[in-house]
Amino acid sequence: MQNNEVIRIDSLPVVQPLNNQEEDSLVLEWYEVNRTIIKRKSLAGRMIHLDKPSSAVLKQGLVIYQDTKCVVRIFIKPCTCMVLQSSNMEVVGLFCFDVGNRHLPIYMIDDHKIAIAYDGRLFPALQQKYGNAVSLANYRLDPSQIINCYGNIYEQNIKKKN
């Protein structure tokens, strides 16, 4: 980085890719994507001040800043997750109920796999109740995968814009 200028972001750009731009990333943990204000350095050392618009959803790869020299994207770090793999909807429903009582967000990884961030007190209880159907694995918990009782908020925001 050539200067100590703070990059202040209060709206997200319309991406117009250029050929010779440097790629940079603002690294976030899964639980930071809903924060309204984020101040930290990017991987390349740029000081970023993100004042997130309330309607914006910070998902993996989202461009949050672009100029003629660089593009800054969101990078959500993978984390240790408790994963239930089951095609039995009753088991999936019970698991979601057990996890929902802890107010942890649930993520749909694929058709038969759901994940939540690791919780050291909850994992043994889930393993005891669901056996080998529950395991630990590393996943990127992206807001586009979150399950809500009224549908996926990310997908609803996309439909409203179209």
In which residue ranges do the predicted regions lie?
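A short, compositionally biased
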Residues: 32-36, 58-59, 101-102
